[in-house]
Amino acid sequence: MGIRRRRLSLLAFALLGLAACSKPYVAPVLPSPYREQIDAPYDAVWRALVRALALENIQIGAIARDSGVIASEAVPTTIGLYANCGRFGDTQVEGDVQVAYTIFVQAVSETRTAVQVNTRMRSENYARGSGKARPRPPLACASTGRWEANLLDTVRALLRQ
C-alpha cells in the first residue's frame, strides 16, 4: 500500500511539474459589434454596401434587403491584421483564421442609415509564436475592427461617386 501511494504521489508531482511549465492561454477580449451611422438614405447605403462586399470578394451566404441583413460565408484571413486570437504566455498566436460577417442595415431617418457589423472568428490552424501553423483545437478570436472600418470607408467612397 505504501509503494502504491508513493507512486501516485510521484505521478501527481510530475504532472504538476509539467503543468507548471506550460504557458497559460490568454484569450482576447471580445469587442462589441462595430456600429456607425452614415449620412445617406437606406437604399443608397444598401447598394454601396453590396458593391463594397463585392470589391472585397466576400461571398454572401444570405441577403435580405427588406430586413436589412447580409450574412457572409466564412472567409480566410491571417491572424494579426484583422483578427486577434490571444496569446500563450507572452507569445502571440499566429496563423490563419476563418471569419464570417453579419451586417445589419437600418434607416435612422430619411437621410441617415445605421450599419452594424458583427464578426465571428475562429482559428483551427495556428502556431504558438512564429513557428509553423498546424491544425489544433479551435480558438475563438476577436476582430481588431480594421476590416469593418475599411468596409464602411469604402461604402462612403462609393456613395460620393
Give each language-model segment a name.
Residues 22-161:
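Ser/Thr-rich, low-complexity intrinsically disordered terminal regions
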Residues 1-10:
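Bacterial N-terminal signal peptides that target proteins for export
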Residues 18-20:
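C-terminal motif of bacterial Sec signal peptides marking the signal peptidase cleavage site
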Residues 11-16:
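Classic N-terminal secretory signal peptides
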